[in-house]
Amino acid sequence: MDSSGPDAASAFVREPTAPVREPAEVALIGFQDQGNLGMGYLVAVLRRHGCAAEMIEIRDGPEAIAKRLLERQPLVVGFSLIFQFFLPQYRRLAQSLRAAGVTSHFTIGGHYPSLCHEELLTNFPEIDSVVRYEGEETLVELVDRLRAGEDWRGISGIAYVRDGAVAATPARPLVQDLDSLPFPDRPYKPERVGGFPTLPVLASRGCIRRCSFCSIHTFYRTAPGKVVRVREPKKVVEEMLDLYRRHGVRVFLFQDDDFPLWGRKGRRWADELMGRMHDSGLADNAIWKISCRAEYVEPELFANMREAGLFLVYMGIESGVESGLEILFKQMTIEQNLDAIATLKRLEIVYSYGFMLFDPSSTFESVRQNVGFLRKIVGDGSAPAVFSRMLPYGGTPIRDQLAKEGRLRGDLTRPDYDFLDLRLNEYYRLLSDTVRPWIHNNGLSNQLSYAWDEIETFARLTPGLRGAKAYRRALGKLTAEANERLFRLVEESSLAFENGDRSPLDPKRIAAYCERARTRLIDLRNVFVADNLDPLTDQVNVDCSSGPVLRPQVH
């Protein structure tokens, strides 16, 4: 987007790392996109135990980070690594810090280090220890041992190298009472969507499902203890109110792996959460987003959630063909996914979704069938078309299966696999390069997705905006047109490639179309914002310090 109007530059604006005054005994380094609640909880728990701790954004760069660490001389430097794709970046940083003279104990945590500690320690010799699984208690004990000059290698929940061999202690049990943890530390200014401050919150940890491509359930099932733990609604709302008052947060992003709506217990929990949102005034003054499975999307429940502030639902649909759902072990049906989307449309709740156009079971025909499924759900322009390829993350069942089949390819940081029809390997590569301006990073689909999130944020937090319906119609028309172009490209190119013809893949033509579509989107958006600049600015600048204002009840 251009530089006019609220939050025009991008969907989220990253603020510089916030300094802490006291020398930090622990410095945690990682990405801070949309906040990093994992690091935030670690810092909060460390401080509760009398340990000075801080967070550092990894994108501050090696020189700035080294300078900061040399000034503060922390006892422990912790690296927060979720995806193995970033391992080279983390290792280069660790090497740079050692070369600069940083002598702190280097530890690392996250999904990949926890599940593949032997692989990581073998390929990342700068690391002294791995904190495995949930790290709050383990990190505190590690700091205590190092502070006292005692041997730390016997504490639960770590891995390390001794005498050239990788060793691991028994896994520490998961935190069973999430409400026993302090609210996570948030040293960064809230990111913004549509000009409104937004921050992540967490109502639960864990996932009851066993999707074959996902490392989340493996992460929680490998450690002892109850897999899914849910916070009390009272505590969740207390945290939201605190963020509303202190930071003016009006948009909350629930980062739960699977928002806890399953079964009767989940419905009762949701009812209490919504009741407390209404009683506190949050339902009238804030909106929130969740991620959940399609089977949880029930009309009555989600209508009530919408009234309590729900505005955006993310679902991992992943496939529109039975073979894909089966190999991904989604334990879902095509009809359930279609029904969920239809329900959200009827309730006028914005949605987004994950979708793997390519998976290990893919054929040229299934790719076209998946496009047909996508056309059913987003052919009307209700959301942009997005898709990806399933990747075999470390610690996932699908990675082990592909290895047994002899199809696993790639390397440590870029795992890959062969399709059963080897022609699909080349087709995927060419298609991915062709549609890069469309579906990658800040491509057209992401720009459209942000536009939908933004208009819904505007409409829900600033009712009565001039031209909102017309803008939505124009946005839907543009989205539908872009989706259909993408669908036809995949259908025509896959059929042609299957028959030995690559001519439909024209990256320059696609890039030119995406640029034209982005220009149209910017123009549409700018006209709408310009027509409503005063009411939008008034709402963005509302003083939230005294708490939400309750609307009068109509009897």
Language model features with spans:
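N-terminal [4Fe-4S]-dependent radical SAM core
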Residues: 2-23, 155, 160-203, 548-550, ...
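Residue-level recognition of beta-strand->loop/alpha-helix junctions
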Residues: 30, 55-59, 218, 355-357, ...
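Flexible glycine/acidic-rich beta-alpha junction loops that bind and position SAM and/or redox cofactors
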Residues: 117, 209, 213, 262-264, ...
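Radical SAM [4Fe-4S] cluster-binding motif and immediate context
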Residues: 179-351, 359, 372
